From Swiss-Prot:
It is a multi-pass membrane protein. It is found in: Cell membrane. Residues 54-59, 144-147, 246-265, 369 are extracellular. This is Putative gustatory receptor 39b. The chain crosses the membrane at residues 33-53, 60-80, 123-143, 148-168, 225-245, 266-286, 349-368. GO terms for cellular component: axon; dendrite; membrane; neuronal cell body; plasma membrane. InterPro entries: 7TM_chemorcpt. Keywords: Cell membrane, Membrane, Receptor, Transducer, Transmembrane, Transmembrane helix. Expressed in the adult labellar chemosensory neurons and in abdominal ganglions. In larvae, is expressed in neurons of the dorsal and posterior pharyngeal sense organs.
Length: 369
């Protein structure tokens, strides 16, 4: 399915986020040079901004904004470098997702289809929203002054579009996990109904040892796909979370400063255009990661319920394979993680919100000194 999107996704290559072409060696070389230019351009912007510091009378605190600005530059460098290093791995990931879809269709008779329209609407709305919300900051930067805004505009666009790309991949992974879970639920229902099972018109096939083995192999391939995704995007996800957290926290603080009339109200346009998209980024991505983990837990629960069925105990080979499958699901959790530093789920969302409150309290105490 990801292959079918590439004619559209390849335009993300203009920001250095995806490879432009799979087979053309010249295109690969040109894009690597282009990506290197993007990295150098960000570094030059950083050097110029630090070497020629702006007036201390401007809206934002110099120290805080340098920290956020550096975080953006580092994050963009990590994102682009990861794409350069994993140029061929990206298309390998696309092929693996395609092969998994074919296996689900051929061996498990699952209609893979496309994502739900709600997923497309969510991704498109977020993508358009991320671009539109840059406009208020541009307006404030033109009419007043925003420290380091113009130097970090390219970084903002790259980070936001990278999030859209990663979100699309996570939605596709979650789609395949849910399909596998539904098929396991069908197997469980067929065992429970016995001879009365009418699913697919063939109860013997759903309850067979070969079908369970195909399910087990599909789950293992799906876990490998998750692992490959984490290798491809792990560092960029980690960097993006750091930027989103720092951006949203600092801009919520400056919003509070504007509301208590420390600064002019026109700066609300800029602060809202940063922390609102950042918060939605964190919320949506954590929810998508949570969905994948819940589907993985559901798969485990279906298998454990199946192991309790009386007919399973009479078939030694089927029971042994089922026990192996249960252990495989427990040990190989289908989760989105950033190089082992964190798993993307609701617990991460709660930790981020708690950390935001803590840092906001600290910032407000410093501002009152």
């Amino acid at each position: 399915m990801l292959y079918s999107f590439h004619p559209y996704l390849k335009y993300f290559a203009l920001l250095g986020l995806v490879p432009w072409s799979e087979s053309c060696a010249q295109s690969k070389f040109v894009q690597k040079v282009y990506s290197a230019i993007l990295i150098i351009l960000n570094a030059v912007h950083f050097g110029i901004s630090i070497y020629f510091p702006q007036s201390a009378e401007l809206f934002l605190s110099l120290m805080v904004n340098v920290i956020v600005f550096v975080a953006r530059i580092v994050c963009v460098t990590v994102i682009i470098l990861q794409v350069m290093v994993h140029y061929d791995d990206y298309f390998r990931f696309c092929r693996e997702m395609k092969y998994l879809g074919l296996r689900l269709q051929c061996e498990l008779k699952i209609h893979v289809g496309r994502l739900k329209w709600q997923s497309y609407a969510k991704i498109l709305a977020l993508g358009i929203g991320f671009l539109v919300t840059v406009l208020p900051s541009i307006y404030v930067a033109l009419s007043g002054s925003l420290l380091y805004f113009w130097s970090s505009l390219l970084s903002i666009l790259i980070i936001r579009m990278q999030f859209v790309l990663v979100l699309l991949n996570v939605e596709l992974l979650g789609h395949h996990v849910s399909l596998l879970g539904i098929r396991l639920q069908n197997v469980l229902e067929c065992h429970l109904m016995g001879a009365n099972c009418t699913l697919d018109g063939n109860a013997n096939r759903l309850c067979s040892l070969e079908f369970l083995l195909a399910l087990k192999q599909s789950h293992m391939q799906l876990h490998y796909l998750f692992t490959h995704f984490n290798d491809l995007f792990g560092w960029s996800i980690l960097g993006t979370y750091v930027v989103l957290f720092s951006d949203s926290t600092v801009n919520i603080y400056w919003t509070q400063q504007v509301l208590v009339e420390v600064y002019e109200y026109k700066y609300l346009y800029a602060t809202f255009s940063v922390f609102v998209p950042s918060f939605f980024n964190i919320l949506v991505f954590c929810r998508c990661g949570e969905f994948c983990q819940r589907q993985s837990v559901l798969i485990g629960s279906y298998l454990r319920n199946l192991s309790c069925h009386p007919s399973i105990g009479r078939e030694t080979s089927y029971k042994d394979l089922l026990m192996e499958f249960i252990l495989q699901v427990e040990q190989n959790v289908l989760a989105i993680n950033a190089e082992g530093f964190m798993s993307t789920d609701n617990s991460l969302l709660m930790s981020i919100l708690a950390a935001k409150v803590t840092y906001l309290i600290v910032l407000m105490q410093f501002s009152s000194v």
